[in-house]
């Protein structure tokens, strides 16, 4: 069959001497302190008396001319009641995200193929389905803000809003 013989053997790698590892084998972390208080009761978490009436303030937005500012300021402060040690901070209610009368821009949120009811021509924003959280536009409308929605860009390769597929 083959008169050239066998393949040459490959030399073995030299054995590495054991050295100090680059990373420590075990990482010693301080132990977390044990909990001293019991968690709050379920009824205590959802009590609607955390924010005192009149304490929540919404910053006013003013522009040089109407429609000048489409974006909201990032830092908003909402005054809450006195902080108690038994109520976790995660359960404090937050004030309105969008101040009333502000304009919120939702880019690419409008689909030209979407229909919101029989003969709907103007932009009405439907409520979220049951069990689903509202999106940014629905939150803004619920809090009295104006919503500006730009059209989603579509082309031949990315698909349109007709719901069809092309198989090559």
Curated annotation (Swiss-Prot):
One function term, GO molecular function aspect = identical protein binding
Q: What are the Low complexity biased-composition ranges?
A: 1-13
Recorded hits in InterPro entries, A to Z, give: DAZ_assoc-2 (IPR022730)
What drives induction of this protein's expression? By serum stimulation.
Post-translationally, this protein is described as follows, namely: Ubiquitinated by SMURF2, leading to proteasomal degradation. Ubiquitinated by NEDD4, leading to proteasomal degradation. Following DNA damage, phosphorylated by HIPK2 which promotes DAZAP2 localization to the nucleus, reduces interaction of DAZAP2 with HIPK2 and SIAH1, and prevents DAZAP2-dependent ubiquitination of HIPK2 by E3 ubiquitin-protein ligase SIAH1 and subsequent HIPK2 proteasomal degradation.
Where, per UniProt, does this protein localize?
Cytoplasm; Nucleus; Nucleus speckle; Nucleus, Nuclear body
Q: Chief localization class? A: cytoplasm
Region feature (Disordered): 1-25
Q: Which UniProt keywords apply?
A: Cytoplasm, Nucleus, Phosphoprotein, Ubl conjugation
The subunit field of the Swiss-Prot or TrEMBL record says: Interacts with SOX6. Interacts with DAZ1 and DAZL. Interacts with IL17RB. May interact with FAM168B. Interacts with INCA1. Interacts with EIF4G1 and EIF4G2. Interacts (via PPAY motif) with NEDD4 (via WW domains). Interacts with transcription factor TCF4; the interaction results in localization of DAZAP2 to the nucleus. Interacts with transcription factors TCF7 and TCF7L1. Interacts with transcription factor LEF1.
What name does the UniProt record give this protein? DAZ-associated protein 2
